[in-house]
């Protein structure tokens, strides 16, 4: 059984969650646009990052769980809001650091978040 490390704190209502995720997706999209080898497409709340080799990293919201989900070649990851940042529900790793690592592994180019 999957044990969650992160719980929303403070709890977000649905509107706050959507606003927070929209900001996250926009930030990821800006980071992808600053690269040479990762294209981004945001449609219907799903952000697709396409690498030069045609592989994809998908970032989307999971509203009922108040999580951000990331699907990549290396696996699936769930992030929940905890202590002021988005944390992997299994490892506790921070979302933007994880995405940078995932992009470096998959696309050969990390995402830089400033």
Predicted segments — roles?
Residues 1-11:
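Short, Lys/Arg-enriched N-terminal segments with co-localized hydrophobic residues
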Residues 9-114:
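N-terminal intrinsically disordered, cationic/polar leader segments
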């Amino acid at each position: 059984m999957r044990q969650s490390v992160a719980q929303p704190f403070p709890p977000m209502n649905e509107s706050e969650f959507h606003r927070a995720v929209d900001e996250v997706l926009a930030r990821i999209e800006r980071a992808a646009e600053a690269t040479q080898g990762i294209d981004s497409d945001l449609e219907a709340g799903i952000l697709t990052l396409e690498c030069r080799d045609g592989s994809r990293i998908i970032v989307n919201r999971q509203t009922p769980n108040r999580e951000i989900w990331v699907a990549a070649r290396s696996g699936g990851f769930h992030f929940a809001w905890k202590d002021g940042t988005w944390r992997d529900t299994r490892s506790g790793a921070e979302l933007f650091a994880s995405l940078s690592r995932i992009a470096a592994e998959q696309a050969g180019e990390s995402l830089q978040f400033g």
